[in-house]
């Protein structure tokens, strides 16, 4: 199979049929074999019933329904698990991403040899606040990752199948899939300017809470890519350093006390110096950081599968 197209769906009953028909038309015209995987992320507006109806008319349309809303990353991860096409393409379900971009994205993976191609919505039709926060966040993500993409959060991306089977997407980390792919060893990452449409139906799901969550997940993915396999490398090093600093401060006060005593001088109480309590506090914090790293190692080595979602039903899968 040439293509697997993964589409997270959350209360987009007005748009998903139009989007699906558009994708079918593009794939048919370009002689691409395909499957369309629609993951219903707990919709309550009849989106699932629409998916069932479309799947009944076309076996290439497949659906998966969560029991509740888990978020976009969960839907993408589940879609990746079901995908079997040589190239996997993700896009949003609100008709703001154009299926007409599919053939060129497919070509960039198959012919040009990219592992991942990210869309760049150079001309956007989003609310002003979303455009501003997006520029700020993309600049930070570029600086943190070293990946020269202009639009990390663009929903329209293409992947080699091996890429999506090698990464784990959770939280709000769908924004940072290029970073996860790079860390997994897939370094041929390209970018394509794509057409962006104004929202045709419904209202945007974007809010400032997603902006905050996105930044927190940027910190998370940065930590995971560097220390996820061995948190002791970070916490153990910091803990040991802080413990040694605190011990040195307390040790200095102790040695000074002994020198005074050896010279038969009246020595001040060790506990009368604020440095004693500062040193003691730093030692305690260092010990706690070390224990945090140790516990992180235990959890990392014994944790069960983190991406476990309750699936209510499937169709054509």
Where are the predicted features?
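Hydrophobic helical membrane-anchoring modules
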Residues: 179-317
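Cell-envelope/extracellular polymer assembly enzymes that use nucleotide-activated donors
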Residues: 2-4, 35
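A conserved acidic beta->alpha catalytic loop
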Residues: 40-49, 95-96
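Short beta-strand/loop segment that forms part of the nucleotide-sugar
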Residues: 20, 32-43, 64-65
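Acceptor/aglycone-binding surface of glycosyltransferases and processive sugar-polymer synthases
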Residues: 60-68, 72-82, 87, 96-176, ...
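Short, well-formed alpha-helical segments that are part of the catalytic scaffolds
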Residues: 12-27
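Acidic helix N-cap motif at the loop->helix transition within catalytic regions
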Residues: 14-18, 45-54
């Amino acid at each position: 199979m040439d293509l697997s197209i993964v589409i997270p769906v959350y209360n987009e009953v007005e748009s998903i049929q139009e989007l699906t028909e558009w994708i079918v038309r593009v794939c048919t015209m370009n002689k691409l074999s395909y499957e369309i995987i629609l993951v219903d992320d707990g919709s309550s507006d009849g989106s699932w019933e629409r998916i069932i109806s479309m799947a009944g008319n076309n076996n290439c349309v497949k659906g998966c329904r969560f029991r509740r809303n888990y978020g976009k990353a969960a839907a993408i991860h589940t879609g990746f698990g079901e995908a079997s096409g040589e190239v996997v393409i993700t896009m949003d379900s609100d008709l703001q991403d154009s299926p007409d971009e599919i053939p060129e994205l497919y070509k960039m993976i198959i012919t040009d040899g990219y592992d991942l191609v990210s869309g760049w919505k150079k001309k956007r039709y989003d609310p002003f606040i979303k455009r501003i926060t997006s520029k700020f966040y993309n600049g930070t993500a570029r600086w943190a990752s070293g990946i020269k993409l202009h639009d990390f959060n663009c929903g329209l991306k293409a992947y080699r199948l091996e890429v999506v089977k090698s990464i784990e997407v959770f939280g709000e980390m769908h924004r940072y899939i290029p970073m996860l792919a790079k860390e997994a060893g897939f370094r041929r990452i390209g970018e394509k300017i794509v057409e962006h449409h104004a929202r045709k139906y419904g209202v945007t799901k974007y809010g400032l809470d997603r902006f905050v969550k996105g930044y927190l997940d940027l910190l998370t993915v940065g930590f995971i890519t560097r220390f996820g396999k061995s948190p002791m490398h970070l916490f153990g090093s910091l803990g040991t350093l802080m413990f040694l600093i605190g011990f040195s401060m307390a040790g200095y006060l102790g040695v000074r006390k002994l020198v005074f005593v050896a010279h038969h001088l009246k020595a001040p109480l060790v506990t009368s110096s604020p440095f004693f309590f500062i040193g003691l506090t730093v030692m305690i914090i260092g010990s706690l950081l070390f224990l945090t790293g140790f516990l992180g190692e235990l959890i990392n080595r014994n944790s069960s599968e983190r991406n476990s979602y309750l699936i209510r039903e499937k169709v054509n899968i």
